[in-house]
């Protein structure tokens, strides 16, 4: 019996283990951590004859596995995995395993630094409105292997793919691939910008059709020469379209331009309820995917009008006395946080901080100076951010450390400055105080609703 070893006990790892088990593999699933939750999962999986090793790393002394599957959150270049590859053990990502089971079906692959999640969710919504069974998977929705485990295979697979997932996928070749934006984000893992670009480019090279965001400075600069057959998008109209074919916005409409045919209006840009120019870029890419899959403008229009947006991405939580509380916890880098500030009404009371990431904060700091009346700093980045704000001559900041304090103080400051918006847009990872950005956003949501509930109760008593 062939032996497989799955690294990482998240939902992706568990789904991969179940898929391999079903195929007749002997499966060990390991995680370097241990906790009550993991111990409970260990007992559950034992009933399915899947061995779970906790607080464990790969052991090269005993019998070696024939195949190693790596969960999306596990760095591709940790010593264990480098050693496994040097020993000639086939080592692939969970997404690649799913692809091997589902490669007879058409995939849409979405990658990029920012904008992936919204674009993926919108594409899935459009395909579903057109009557397709088209689950979103990968970084959002299901783990890719959960889709592979389904009794009845879907019509399309809409996969959000991080650079880690692409790096660990050897043969993954979607029918349509989309590259949303390219900014130096995950450099800790990928060492250099070129390396990070090459990884993402691999996905598009292996795809049948490519769609690029032509409004992204980096992609448009290198794009036309590298990708002569691609479809480009631009929110700035036909003049800004790279190449002969693509999708652009003109007179408030998304317009399709294909070779040898007149431009065709597909959907009104105002049909999308989400705020911000960057969401029009996401809309264009989603429409491009839908049209390349021959989906009718009617289905596109219906899906776009009904699309609610994405949690943790400029998510409107509540309004109290004219002050909007907005959760943008997904803004884990300077670029995304700058977009967040640009997309809401100003002046803003901004909550920022967490675990800082490398990057250029210049544009973000300028946006803070232009748009905010106060900044509340949380998490381990707070002292460094305070220092940076001081250096650019911005003094309306306070270090509050925790989300609880930040939310309470934000309401006081918003009232004082008559600011219409309290915005959580951290520009940081969340790992100093939370398991992930979702947990951070959920906590913010909870605190806002609690605070507003309290205020309403109090005002009813007077």
UniProtKB/Swiss-Prot annotation:
It catalyses: UDP-N-acetyl-alpha-D-muramoyl-L-alanine + D-glutamate + ATP = UDP-N-acetyl-alpha-D-muramoyl-L-alanyl-D-glutamate + ADP + phosphate + H(+). Transmembrane segments: none annotated. It comes from Nostoc sp. (strain PCC 7120 / SAG 25.82 / UTEX 2576). Belongs to the MurCDEF family. GO terms for cellular component: cytoplasm. Keywords: ATP-binding, Cell cycle, Cell division, Cell shape, Cell wall biogenesis/degradation, Cytoplasm, Ligase, Nucleotide-binding, Peptidoglycan synthesis. InterPro entries: Mur-like_cat_sf, Mur_ligase_C, Mur_ligase_C_dom_sf, Mur_ligase_cen, MurD. Its EC number is 6.3.2.9. It comes from the Bacteria. It is found in: Cytoplasm. It holds the Pfam family Mur_ligase_M. This is UDP-N-acetylmuramoylalanine--D-glutamate ligase. One of its GO terms (biological process) is peptidoglycan biosynthetic process. Pathway: Cell wall biogenesis; peptidoglycan biosynthesis. ATP binds at residues 112-118. Gene3D superfamilies: Mur ligase, C-terminal domain, Mur-like, catalytic domain, NAD(P)-binding Rossmann-like Domain. One of its GO terms (molecular function) is UDP-N-acetylmuramoylalanine-D-glutamate ligase activity. Cell wall formation. Catalyzes the addition of glutamate to the nucleotide precursor UDP-N-acetylmuramoyl-L-alanine (UMA).
């Amino acid at each position: 019996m062939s032996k497989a070893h799955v690294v990482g006990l998240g939902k992706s790892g568990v789904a991969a283990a179940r898929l391999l088990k079903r195929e007749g593999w002997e499966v060990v699933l390991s995680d370097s951590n241990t906790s009550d939750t993991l111990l409970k999962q260990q007992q559950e999986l034992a009933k399915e004859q899947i061995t779970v090793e906790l607080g464990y790393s790969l052991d090269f002394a005993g019998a070696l596995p024939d195949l190693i599957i790596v969960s999306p959150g596990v760095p591709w270049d940790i010593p264990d995995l480098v050693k496994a590859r040097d020993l000639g053990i086939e080592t692939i990502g969970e997404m690649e395993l799913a692809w091997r089971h589902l490669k007879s079906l058409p995939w849409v692959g979405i990658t990029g630094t920012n904008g992936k999640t919204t674009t993926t969710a919108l594409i899935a919504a459009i395909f579903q409105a057109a009557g397709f069974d088209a689950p979103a998977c990968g970084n959002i929705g299901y783990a890719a292997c959960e889709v592979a485990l389904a009794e009845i295979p879907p019509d399309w697979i809409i996969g959000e793919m991080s650079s880690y997932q692409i790096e660990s996928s050897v043969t993954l070749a979607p029918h349509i691939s989309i590259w949303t934006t390219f900014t130096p984000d995950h450099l800790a893992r990928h060492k250099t910008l070129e390396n990070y670009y090459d990884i993402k480019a691999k996905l598009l090279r292996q795809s049948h059709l490519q769609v690029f965001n032509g409004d992204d400075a980096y992609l448009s600069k290198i794009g036309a020469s590298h990708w002569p057959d691609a479809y480009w998008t631009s929110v700035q109209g036909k003049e800004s379209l790279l190449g002969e074919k693509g999708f652009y916005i003109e007179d408030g409409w998304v317009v399709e331009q294909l070779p040898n045919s007149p431009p065709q209006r597909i959907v009104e840009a105002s049909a999308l309820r989400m705020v911000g120019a960057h969401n029009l870029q996401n809309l264009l890419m989603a429409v491009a995917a839908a049209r390349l899959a021959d989906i009718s403008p009617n289905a596109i229009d219906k899906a776009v009008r009904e699309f609610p947006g994405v949690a943790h991405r400029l998510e409107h939580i509540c309004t109290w006395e004219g002050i909007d509380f907005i959760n943008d916890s997904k803004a884990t880098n300077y670029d995304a946080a700058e977009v967040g500030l640009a997309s809401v009404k100003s002046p803003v009371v901004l909550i920022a901080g967490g675990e800082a990431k490398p990057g250029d904060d210049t544009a973000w700091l300028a946006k803070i100076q232009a748009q905010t009346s106060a900044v509340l700093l949380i998490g381990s980045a707070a002292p460094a951010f305070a220092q940076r704000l001081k250096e650019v001559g911005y003094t309306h900041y306070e270090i509050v450390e925790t989300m609880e304090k930040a939310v309470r103080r934000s309401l006081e400051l918003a009232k004082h400055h008559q600011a219409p918006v309290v915005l959580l847009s951290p520009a940081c990872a969340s790992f100093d105080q939370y398991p992930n950005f979702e947990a951070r956003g959920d906590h913010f949501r909870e605190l806002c609703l609690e605070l507003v509930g309290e205020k309403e109760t109090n005002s009813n008593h007077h």
